[in-house]
Regions:
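A cross-family signal for key residues in well-ordered alpha-helices
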Residues: 18, 50, 56, 96
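Active-site phosphate/pyrophosphate-handling residues
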Residues: 3, 15, 46-47, 93
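Residues in the helix-turn-helix
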Residues: 12, 41, 48
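Amphipathic alpha-helical dimerization/coiled-coil segments
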Residues: 22, 74-107
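Beta-hairpin "wing" of winged helix-turn-helix
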Residues: 51-61, 67
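Alpha-helical residues within the helix-turn-helix
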Residues: 33, 44, 50-51
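N-terminal helix-turn-helix DNA-binding core of bacterial DNA-binding proteins
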Residues: 2-38, 63-79
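Base-recognition residues in the alpha-helical recognition helix of bacterial helix-turn-helix
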Residues: 18, 43-44
Length: 107
């Protein structure tokens, strides 16, 4: 999971992921058109994203297509975000219930 966090720590790599989210299955050239980076920089960032399993490559003939792989992001969500979110939602639910009970007792 550390490799995923390291990959996500860079703004340029997050921009690449955002671009793939907008239009999945892009070639290197297509990605370069939408980003203010050299072809070499995009290639470097894509390799790091592939190593983190955030991007997968599919060859279509001579074209190398890059696809966003959401699985590592989902794993982060489940491990780090989801578990804290559940507690907050439960606390809000308990607060709402308590306020409603208090209102009913007074009214």
């Amino acid at each position: 999971m550390d490799v995923v966090f390291k990959a996500l720590a860079d703004e340029s790599r997050r921009k690449l992921l955002d671009q793939l989210h907008k239009s999945n299955g892009q070639t290197l050239g297509e990605l370069c058109e939408h980003l203010d980076m050299t072809r070499q920089a995009v290639t470097k960032h894509l390799l790091l994203l592939e190593a983190a399993n955030l991007v997968v490559v599919v060859w279509r003939g001579r074209e190398k297509l890059h696809y966003l792989n959401p699985v590592p992001l989902q794993e982060i969500y489940e491990r780090w975000i989801g578990k804290y979110e559940r507690h907050r939602l439960q606390a809000l639910s308990d607060l709402k219930k308590g306020l409603e009970e208090n209102k009913n007792q007074k009214g």
